[in-house]
A protein has these predicted regions:
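Nucleic-acid endonuclease domains
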Residues: 1-43, 50-245
Length: 245
């Protein structure tokens, strides 16, 4: 993320009193918002975005993982002036998962067919294909698996794939190695099915102009919390809502 974008998004987090993760280590979560409603505490994951234009950038290589995550997030978007030295915040939008769904669904529609093809094609790989790619062996080593699937698995996952014992040593069976080959094929195909930085469109964002989704100062945090609270009350079973206590 460019330094300027990161600084603006940190500013938004402070204004809206969000819990910011500077390393984005919560599985790609920018921040979280905790709210109390009727003696219960709830948590919403927040996607924090900023823009100096009329659209909003998202991410590189957007695939189905992004789609699934976005459907469980509150979007807080700050729109800034285009001044080179110090862009000033003009206005903000706070959009719920249901607000974002039409745009998210439009992105899903663009990539879904390719992701289905990736899944179906990988399932058709058989042992003959494994032998052609990795050589014909009775069993395979972790090193063989790493050459195939590279850094897509952790050391623990590679160790767990050793499903066969020969003497005192563990190996990977042909069946398990074929599964790894299928996973690798699916991963490669899915990489080609992603979209590069699809923008949240002006047409979608304009539908919220003049509504209560526009957050104004000076009580920025209160505005976001009201939108979040109304969302939880209206959609108590939504997957985005996490009950803390």
């Amino acid at each position: 993320m460019p330094v300027q974008d990161d600084e603006r998004e940190r500013e938004l987090v402070r204004m809206f009193n969000l819990d910011w993760d500077p390393a984005h280590q919560r599985a790609g979560v920018d921040a979280v918002l905790d709210i109390d409603i009727d003696d219960h505490s709830y948590r919403l994951e927040v996607e924090v975005k900023s823009s100096t234009g009329t659209t909003v950038s998202t991410a590189r290589d957007v695939g189905m993982d992004h789609i699934q995550k976005w459907r469980r997030k509150l979007f807080v978007i700050g729109f800034y002036s285009k001044e080179a030295r110090r862009p000033e915040l003009q206005h903000c939008l706070c959009l719920t998962p249901t607000d974002m769904e039409p745009w998210i669904a439009s992105i899903e529609e663009k990539i879904l067919i390719d992701f289905k093809l990736a899944r179906l094609a990988s399932r058709r790989l058989v042992l003959k294909d494994l032998f052609e790619v990795c050589g014909k062996k009775d069993t395979y080593s972790v090193e063989d698996a790493k050459r195939l699937h590279k850094q897509q698995w952790t050391a623990e996952e590679y160790a767990a794939a050793q499903d066969t014992m020969i003497g005192t040593k563990r190996w990977i069976s042909q069946k398990k190695m074929l599964e790894i080959l299928q996973l690798r094929s699916k991963y490669i195909a899915e990489r080609g099915a992603t979209l590069n930085n699809p923008h949240v469109t002006k047409a979608h964002l304009d539908t919220f102009v003049g509504t209560d989704r526009v957050v104004k100062g000076p009580n920025w945090a209160a505005g976001v919390r009201k939108i979040a609270t109304d969302f939880v009350r209206s959609n108590p079973d939504h997957a985005a809502i996490m009950l803390i206590s």
